[in-house]
């Protein structure tokens, strides 16, 4: 089993827009961090933990072509804000459509469903 850290930044990522602290103004590339997320790999299975706004870039950067499931730790936007980008994985091998299971607490999944239904009404 392998754990890949996809992001370890704050809810806004690092650097934070407009911040002038030493970390946010640092030239050290280690101080540039995407929002928190990780991926577990074992055998041929990939489980992503949280899909925040940086999800698309995190997947492109790691060269991932498929995921099997997503675990959402809670309903804050920095953990669910990239779910729309998950759709691309459903159609990687079109016309075969891949199902991706999403796990979370009842409250988290309720919030995701509500968020998705509100987007469709706009």
Outline where the language-model segments fall.
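Conserved beta-strand hairpin/beta-sheet module of binuclear metal-dependent hydrolase folds
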Residues: 1-62
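Cofactor-binding loop segments of dinucleotide-utilizing enzymes, especially the Rossmann-like FAD-
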Residues: 8, 105-107
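Short amphipathic alpha-helical surface micro-motifs
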Residues: 20-22, 54, 83-85, 115-117
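Detector for Asparagine
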Residues: 31-32, 90, 115
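Active-site metal-binding motif and surrounding structural segment of the metallo-beta-lactamase
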Residues: 46-47, 51-104
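A short, active-site helix/loop in glycosyltransferases that binds the activated sugar's phosphate group
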Residues: 107-116
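Conserved small/polar residues in nucleotide/adenosyl-binding loops
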Residues: 119-122
């Amino acid at each position: 089993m392998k754990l890949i850290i996809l992001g370890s930044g704050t809810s806004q990522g690092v650097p934070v827009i407009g911040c002038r602290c030493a970390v946010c103004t640092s030239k050290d590339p280690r101080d540039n961090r995407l929002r928190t997320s990780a991926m577990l790999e074992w055998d041929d299975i990939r489980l992503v933990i949280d899909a925040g706004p940086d999800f698309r870039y995190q997947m492109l950067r790691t060269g991932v072509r498929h995921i099997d499931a997503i675990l959402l730790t809670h309903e804050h936007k920095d953990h669910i804000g990239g779910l729309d980008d998950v759709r691309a994985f459903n159609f990687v091998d079109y016309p075969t459509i891949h199902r991706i299971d999403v796990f979370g607490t009842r409250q988290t999944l309720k919030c995701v469903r509500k968020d998705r239904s509100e987007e469709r009404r706009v």
